[in-house]
Each structure stands twice: as structure tokens, then as C-alpha cells.
């Protein structure tokens, strides 16, 4: 995994970065999702909305690069939407580095012919010049993709909130009304009994007992208020969230279509106007279905309110309680119609639902739109007699008109949403395929074979290490090759522009003596192997070293290696003539070697068998990990030395207490040797942590 940010500057890019996004002027701000629903919706809550807007306002392109097995590599713009899929790179990916000018991608892979054989580490440089050549266009397209991806997530979470609002009343409906229907023992239908109560004002003794003992007046009132509140919440979510999100999605897709029609700029990137038009049509169908749901909610609310008001008054009269004057009034014909419609819709026999919701209680009209199922609506809207539908059926020209969005009267809102997501994904997948196919292999170098002893070490900590010098536009690769029991550090560098070359493309670095003579042996006989190396910044490499002869009292060293001591102005060394039929370790004798003396830029790592290092030059921090992966030390680098402060937290485990040789002992006399370094160059261990890293 690798994250990069474009740093290239040009007049075209500067004008693009400074240009204001018109969507901020033309589109209303998306309302925040309610916090009382799903926790996943909190990303669009009031507290998080500013962070989302900040992300969408970041015009400078940054990308997340992911690599997997079988040479599968993906590039995600802003870490959200895929803009390139690269295939065909041999081996399993172990390292990635996309140059900040987008001209090339460095890849380290591990190729293993069979399960028992040694793996071969190979370096590839992939040409990604299409991204670099069309950087303004890629950036604008990626911004649109990010907007569209964010809006799809916003719509999905809005629908999730609607479903949760509906589930609140669905549980109450099931536990009360369905139970009431199932326990009915009379031969007449529930619908007939309620109709008798509606028309004659009298209920059967059984219906009266069930209403008064199970449902109760108080329970009915509470149920009615809960249902009305949930209806209002769903209605508000449709109007303020689904519709606003869909309209914004339609706007950005329309802009994307306009970009696709500018073939000179965007055709090479794979934007397809016809595919985007299909996506626009799918969004239109979703908007139509959302509007249909609004009409159903409005109709159902009227029926529900009328039914519960009527039943509430009827139950008050059954219990001989006082009926308020505003409730004790003659029902109008419209009220009777609403109640009759409710009874017809919800207490009508539906044999296909016997095993799902109760034998005589039909699925609620609003809830069927929110079900994430492929089945058709149980109660689709009645379009008979609708003049517009009749006009469309009789018009041969309008039936296939691209100006009209398709309408799916038999499908739920969830179904239409999934169809919209599928069409949009297909539409936006093509650029990733086209850009991925444009990426081709420019360089392939077999470096070395891994030793069997390294198999148990997590690959996360293993060299090689990749780095991109954003100023000089150079790719670096750090790795070690064991030669005569000493691990030299090799520095491979290549220009990000695959058509250009750099001097000293491959060099080996060995470390001469730099420790004080007071450490046991003579300085002339001491050699150091490189255990791990990471770039601290563009000019410095942080390394972990050990003496080649492992003995008790031989300490590991954390040091800073300036590249200026490796690449000097008077370099006239002969360049390696690469033999592509051999691995690099088979040609190591022909590689120029630099012997480096680090002077004051080092520190002895006392009482720790250090093996791995990770650094951050921006934060000026280095982190050292022990060889058994159990102990960590954190160092502050390049700080003023106001007096060394050390905080040690000794981990007391049974293994260490038993004398496990994970940590080396250092005499107190040797501690003074650390203090001879420069105050600005010496790593200052201001904080040290030793903790167990076992899972």
C-alpha cells in the first residue's frame, strides 16, 4: 500500500486549482443525516460534514496505490474511487511507489516458482505517462468520481435511516395488530368485523374483548403516535436527503457527460458518453421511484390517521370514557373512505404472505418500498385511469424516447437504487480499465533470492524499501545482499521518466569504523552489516547496523547516512553493464562500492537486539523494532540536546525473566561513548517504549 500526492506545478494546473467548483454555487448544501439512527450515518452528521466537505474541496490530486497477489495493482484517486487497474505484473507485490509526477510506478514483487523453492525478488518500473500527460483531466475526472462516490454513499445511508425509522413501527405493528389478527376465533374475517364496527358502531363481543384487553386505549394511542412520527421521519428523509442527493448526483453525472463529449481531452482516459447517459437515466428512474414513495406516504398517512382516530373514539365509547368534543364529531364521507381504504389494504387476505407477516394482515404499503428484496411490490400503485400513462401507452414515439426516464411501477425503491448503483459502477469502471491497459512495463530487474531463514519474518518489515525523491524526480530502491558474511546496502535509483537515465544507477555502500576505540576491540578489525534501512527524507537514509561478528556485548547502531557522502561530485565510476540473464546478486562483484564513515551521526542502541527501523522525516521520529518483534523504541531525531532524557519501561515477562537472549547487556562504561555526537545530528531518545507486540 502506498499513498502519494501530486506535487507538479504548471500554469494549467495552477489555473485549475484556483478555479472555483461551480457545484458549490449551483447546488444546495447536503443536509446532515439525523444522529439518532445508524452509527454508519454519523460520517454525514453535523460534526463530520465539515470533514467531508474538506475532502471534496481538496483539488490537488492524491492517490492510494494497492498491490496484491498475482501482480494485481489498483490506483484510487483521493483513496476513494478507482482510476486504474493494472494486471500482468509477475509475482506477489511486496512494495509500491508511485512517483509524484505520475510518470512511473516502482514495484517490488516476490516470484516463487514452487512452494519449496526460494523466492526471487524483482524490481519493475511501470510507465504511467498517460496519467502524467493528462494530469489536469485526470484530476478533474477523479474529483467528479469522488463526488459521485460520496453521493452514492450518502443516498445509501439516507435509505438506511429510512429503513430504521420504518423498523421501529414494524415491530410494534407485528407484535400488536398481527397477534390480534392471528388470535381471532370467529368465522367472519377481520375486515368484515371492522367494517361492521365502522358502519353500525357496534363490535362483536370477541372483537370488543380483544380491543380492550390486548390493544387497550393507551396502547392504541401510543402506537398511533409512533407510526405518525416514523412516517414524518421517512417523509423528511425522502424530501431533504434522497431528493437533494439524487439531484446533486444527476448534476455531477451531467457534467461528467459533458467532459466525455470533449473527446480530445477525455477519450484517451476512457470516459464513455453513452455509458454515462445510461447512468443519468438510472438516476432519473430512482428520483421517480422516490417521488412515488412520497405519494404513497402521503396517502398512507391520511388512511392511518383516520383509522386510528376512528378506532380510538370507538374504544373510548366501549370503555364508557369521556370523549373530547374535538373527537366526538360526525365522520365525513372522506373520513369513512380513508378508514375503508385502510381496512381494504391491510386486513385483506393475502395467501402468499401467510408464512411472513400473519394470515390476515397485509404488508404495509410504505414498508414494501424499503425492503431490500428483488420481489415485486405486493401493493403496487394503481395506474389505471391515469391519463399520462394512457397517453404514453398509445404513443409509439414516446415509448422509446431517451427524454423520458424509465418507470418501474412493480419494483421497490431498494431495487431501483441497486440498479442505479450497478449502472454507475459499470460506467465509471471503464476509465480504470483503459488507464490500466495503458500502463506498461519499462524496466524489469531480478535483484536476489530470499533466504529460507527469512520465511518466518513478516514481509511488512523486510527490505527492499522504495522511495520517491519529489524534487529530483528519482525512484530509489534500498536492499541488502549478503557478501562474505557482511550485508552491504545497495541503492538502486532510476529517473521517474522511463526515457531518461541517471548516473550511478546502482551502488553498494559499506560502513567503515565510526565507533570509539573504547569499545572492546581495535577499530581496524571492525566491520558492520546493514540490517535495515529506510529513507528519512530526500537527502538522508536511516540505517540499523550490527558488527559482522555477533558476540556478547556487540551493540546495534542506529545511524543517519547522508546521500551526499554516497553520491559525490567527483564520481567517475564505471557504470554497471547490466546482464538481464542474471540476477543482480550474481553480478554484485561488478557494482561500485562506497565506504562511508558516519562520523557523529549515529547512536548505540543499548540493551536491545534491534533489527528493523521505520522513520518519518516530517515528524522527525524513528521507531526501532527488536529482532523478535516484541520490543519497540521510539526516538526523536534532529532536536536540540538539552540534556538527554531517557524513559525506559522494562517489560517483565516470564521469557525475559528466564534469560531469553533477546536483549543484549551493555556495561555502564560504554554509555559515555554515546555522548560524543553533535547536538543537532544525534538522535535524541526522548521517549522509549518497550511493549509486547504479540497478537
Task: Give each language-model segment a name.
Residues 1, 73-78, 123-124, 635:
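WD40-repeat beta-propellers
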Residues 70, 79, 111, 547-549:
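Residue-level signature of beta-propeller blades and closely related beta-rich strand-turn architectures
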